[in-house]
Amino acid sequence: MKKFLLSSSVLSANFSRLGEDIFDVLKSGSDMIHYDVMDNHYVKNLTFGPIVLESLRSVEKIKSMVIDVHLMTCPVDDLIIKFAKLDVNIISFHPESTNNVEKTIKLIKSYGCKVGLALNPLTPLCVLDNVLDKIDLILLMSVNPGFPGQKFIPSILNKIRIVRELIDKSKKNILLEVDGGINLSNIFKIASFGTDIFVIGSAIFNSINYDLTIRSFRDVLKNINCKK
């Protein structure tokens, strides 16, 4: 049975009670926390930095959470070091944000973190050609990065299918993560095209009952496994 993972994006959380929101979604069954870092240069928004995460890591009831960091910054290397020192689990970056993709991959690995390469909707898949054997995760953006609450771009489904085929053909243990506009109406289709990790923000944090919402996502994904 395929294991699907839910990564709750705190970009959609209530910032006035961020620690409590994170605790609540983890308690409700989220597998990890997706931590979007934006610098108002690479994308036109400004979000969290390492200081906020360091503070969250000090909260006893959530300090062991799995952290999936998505860097939408330029440059990235200095921030990679700061986040890696906070014992994050995954660090994903965009190939356009560095002068040397392979060097940045090595930097992340040198700190013992898993490496993700993040691709915007218009980023060509040829950027994967020389690094597929060096990364642990491919993060496909299914919205234009920068702001929460956007609608899923339908054409990304074909991109998911192609990347899934590339991963399977490589026979590498690479996870495929999709981020943007995922909800209860479209997660079945997104999963059926080969996604492993679903970054979900508004659909969880804007819901009244995290337990019920996350359970509903799990129920849909169970149906995928039943049909295989």
UniProtKB/Swiss-Prot annotation:
Cofactor binding remark: Binds 1 divalent metal cation per subunit.
Cofactor(s) listed: a divalent metal cation
Binding site for a divalent metal cation: H34, D36, H70, D179
Example of a GO biological process term: pentose-phosphate shunt
PROSITE patterns per UniProt: RIBUL_P_3_EPIMER_1 (PS01085), RIBUL_P_3_EPIMER_2 (PS01086)
SUPFAM superfamilies referenced in this protein's UniProt entry, alphabetically: Ribulose-phoshate binding barrel
Residues reported to bind substrate: S9, H70, G146, F147, P148, G149, D179, G180, G181, G201, S202
InterPro entries according to UniProt: Aldolase_TIM, Ribul_P_3_epim, Ribul_P_3_epim-like, RibuloseP-bd_barrel
Gene Ontology MF, one: D-ribulose-phosphate 3-epimerase activity
Annotated active site: D36 (proton acceptor), D179 (proton donor)
Substrates-to-products reaction catalysed: D-ribulose 5-phosphate = D-xylulose 5-phosphate
Record carries keyword Metal-binding: yes
UniProt keyword Isomerase, yes or no: yes
EC number assigned by the record: 5.1.3.1
Pathway: Carbohydrate degradation
Pfam families: Ribul_P_3_epim (PF00834)
Broadest EC class assigned to this enzyme: isomerase
Entry keyword set: Carbohydrate metabolism, Isomerase, Metal-binding
Family: Belongs to the ribulose-phosphate 3-epimerase family.
Function: Catalyzes the reversible epimerization of D-ribulose 5-phosphate to D-xylulose 5-phosphate.
Protein name: Ribulose-phosphate 3-epimerase
Origin organism lineage: Bacteria, Pseudomonadati, Pseudomonadota, Gammaproteobacteria, Enterobacterales
